[in-house]
Each structure stands twice: as C-alpha cells, then as structure tokens.
Amino acid sequence: KRQLYEGQFFPMTRGVSGALEMANTLRGSDFFYDFYEDPDALKELLKYCAHALVWYYDKQLEAAGQVFGGTITGFGEWLPGRAVGQLSEDTTTMISRAQFEEFGRPLTQKICTHYDSAFMHTHALSEHSLPAIASIPGIRAMELSSDPNTDRAVEVYKRNREALAGPVPVLRLTRGEIESNFELLKSQKTIVWYDASCMEDAQDMAALFAREFPVR
C-alpha cells in the first residue's frame, strides 16, 4: 500500500465514546439503576469519564497530526482544527431526554467545547433526545444511524428537521431514499453515505449526484 500511494497517507483518529457510554461500560447494567439509586455518585463517575476521554482523544490527535489544518475523524470526515470525532451518544437510546439533559449533556458539551469542532454519532432510536444533542455548541456534523423496529433515519430526521437545524446531517441512504428525497438534499447541506454493491454501482451513483447536485 505504501508503494501504491507513494508514501502519502491521511491518518484518521479512532474517535471516542461519550461519557455516558464509558460509564455504562464500566458499570454494566447497574448503570441504569444508578440514575435512581445513586445519582450523585453517577455524576462524579461521569466527570471522571469525560476527563479520561479528553485525555485519550488528545493522545489520538497527537499521534495522527493535522491534515490540511484539520482532523480526519474516525468515520472519514474532515473537520477544521483540532476536531473530535466520532463522539458517540448511543446510550441515549436507553435513557430519557430529561436524564440526558441532567447527566449527559453537561459532559458532552465539556468534551465538544474542548475542541474546535465535533462529529457526533447518534441513532434513530434516540429521537427523543436528538434536539438536545444537536443544540450542543461545537457539533459541526451529526450522523443519524438507522435502527431495527423504528423508522428509517431519514424519516426521523425529516420529522425533527427544524430542531436539528444546527449540525450538518449525515445520513446513510439507499438508492430509493436518495431518489425520493431530492428536494430535501437540494435544500440544504447534507453528507450522504451510500453502500455501493460494486464499482459500477458506485460510478453510477457518482454520476447521479453530479447530474442532480452540480457543484456551483
């Protein structure tokens, strides 16, 4: 590979979980009881997790370095400056918005504002908390993943479009979803991920985007 690319590489960071996810990993299922049985201790644990995550991600940035004055995140996006990404809020699928606002949001905001910008990873099952996440300062792009047993991410996004107006949305779409959402995609900045089945499919989709969304 080094010969193929003539020694030119774009290093990317791995990214980090949010403080809630790290605490969940440490506490296991008892984490969800902690909200009710020992909330003060949980808040102290979350502070520790946020501090540890910043320390860990700073080490990643130190190792990866900057690319054209920015950072390539764990999902391959380039963000300006010392950016954090991906930062994950998967645990919000299992807690209420009120719990996120009280326990998670302050620490997520602390992590985001430590850096110049952030790439956030979320899930459609977190629909109830998505507006609270999107309102955190510093989030430049927010991925919304689809989940089983709920509406597709693009439909969840459209329902909450006004409340999620801050970050650039990142949506993994099928060909059918792309073709049926031209109006949405033409009306705003959107990062589209598409899983091509082969090179021909990828080239065909690239041609479709060049035709329907010409660079001005």
Can you annotate each of these PLM segments?
Residues 1-216:
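Active-site loop segments of alpha/beta catalytic cores
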